[in-house]
UniProtKB/Swiss-Prot annotation:
KSH activity is completely inhibited by zinc ions. KshA is specifically inhibited by Fe(3+), Co(2+), Zn(2+) and Ni(2+) ions. Homotrimer. The two-component system 3-ketosteroid-9-alpha-monooxygenase is composed of an oxygenase component KshA and a reductase component KshB. Optimum temperature is 33 degrees Celsius. The lineage of its organism: Bacteria, Bacillati, Actinomycetota, Actinomycetes, Mycobacteriales. Fe cation binds at residues 175, 181, 186, 305. Keywords: 2Fe-2S, Iron, Iron-sulfur, Lipid degradation, Lipid metabolism, Metal-binding, Oxidoreductase, Steroid metabolism. This is 3-ketosteroid-9-alpha-monooxygenase, oxygenase component.
Length: 378
């Protein structure tokens, strides 16, 4: 047996543990129009169950799903007027969480209240506010409006929903600073990559091309396209990305939503969608086709991410190079949503900017692509 004279210190992975609480902030639970079909909808989120329904004016409401009478599931009930009726005993609950009627009883219990969740509808999607302390959202936390969305300047949303098991939401948020994974996982060539953190907002600015040796998604349809992406997380779970796709002298502007909400502390629902801004000469059908093409490409990319998450370890102490970006700063920023408001510290919210020097990475990547192309040509 050979015993080394000097023991080399081995770096071990600290997997840590997932937070037991759910993030404070606005969480998108889906397209608003999907909840306006005259039926109640059950949403599993934040370790509980909610029911979403529309009243006669079309306003969406979100309540705890289980009736305070005998625990019936309101999502299995029926919308009656401006109330949701329990399928068990027909108790009627309005959008503010008050019991309005018990049809078989002489009186309605004065203490008949259930939890009504704070909601916001913006850009055609529905948000629910969550805070473990019970605080209400302040105006500066509102999701920004997309200019021209209400005026018909954009296509309709294309939308995809995927349930991710065995991973915490932080896995997808880590992608905000992960420049290198765009090359290895998504087959893109990032030429410029910068992060900006400020308050509750985290930004990612990227300029990229597709790889010449591997064509997937949008690259199949627009092989020479340059992608200019300015993406911002508004809080812990909702990203709005403005993307300019430049190809053959034409610039196409699109908006990407990349959002998620936690189901448990080890599973979440990932949702994403695209709208395309209509340009002169572009028909409604062409704009819709373009949005579908972009969303199909996103679905392929997220499938690549999910395959990584399914088989990786959670890691609290990643070993990094300068080109890996500000991972630890991102996580400090992200932690502000998992502590009480009074425990948010300046290093979680102060402005922080970091631009990755991509020169060494590009040198290596261009060489790898050239070698792959040469091997294919043989």
């Amino acid at each position: 047996m050979t015993v080394p004279q000097e023991r080399i210190e081995i770096r071990n992975i600290d997997p840590g543990t997932n937070p037991t609480r759910f993030a404070r902030g606005w969480h998108c639970i889906g397209l608003a129009k999907d909840f306006r079909d005259g039926k109640p909808h059950q949403v599993k989120v934040f370790g509980t169950d909610l029911v979403v329904f529309a009243d006669t004016a079309g306003k969406l409401h979100v309540l705890d799903a289980f009736c305070r009478h005998m625990g019936g599931n309101l999502a299995r009930g029926e919308i009656k007027g401006d109330t949701i009726a329990c399928p068990f005993h027909d108790w009627r609950w309005n959008g503010q969480g008050r019991c309005e009627a018990v049809p078989y009883a002489r009186r309605t219990p004065k203490l008949g209240r259930t939890k009504a969740w704070t909601t916001m509808e913006r850009n055609g999607v529905l948000f629910v506010w969550h805070c473990p302390q019970g605080s209400e959202p302040t105006p500066e936390l509102a999701i920004p409006e997309i200019e021209g969305y209400e005026d018909g300047q954009w296509s309709d949303w294309t939308w995809t929903t995927i349930h991710v098991e065995g991973s915490h939401c932080r896995e997808i948020v880590d992608n905000v600073v992960d420049m290198a994974h765009f090359f290895y996982v998504h087959f893109q060539m990032p030429e410029y990559f910068k992060n900006v953190f400020d308050g509750h907002i985290a930004g990612q600015h990227m300029r990229s091309y597709g790889r010449d040796d591997i064509k997937t998604g949008v690259q199949m349809d627009l092989p020479e396209a340059q992608t200019i992406s300015d993406a911002f997380y508004y809080g812990p779970s909702f990203m709005l990305d403005t993307i300019y796709t430049v190809s053959e002298g034409t610039t196409i502007e699109s908006k990407l939503i990349n959002c998620h909400y936690p189901v448990t502390n080890n599973s979440f629902v990932l949702q994403f969608g695209t709208i395309v801004k209509k340009i002169e000469g572009m028909s409604e059908e062409q704009a819709a086709e373009m949005a579908t093409m972009f969303t199909d490409g996103l679905e392929e990319q997220f499938a690549q991410d999910i395959e990584i998450w399914k088989h990786k370890s959670r890691i609290e102490n990643p070993l990094l190079t300068e080109e890996d970006g500000p991972v630890y700063q991102l996580r400090r920023w992200y932690n502000q949503f998992y502590v009480d408001l009074e425990d948010v510290t300046p290093d979680m919210t102060q402005r922080f900017e970091f631009e990755v020097d991509t020169s060494r990475a590009l040198e290596s990547w261009h060489k790898e692509v050239e070698e792959n192309l040469a091997g294919t040509a043989e």
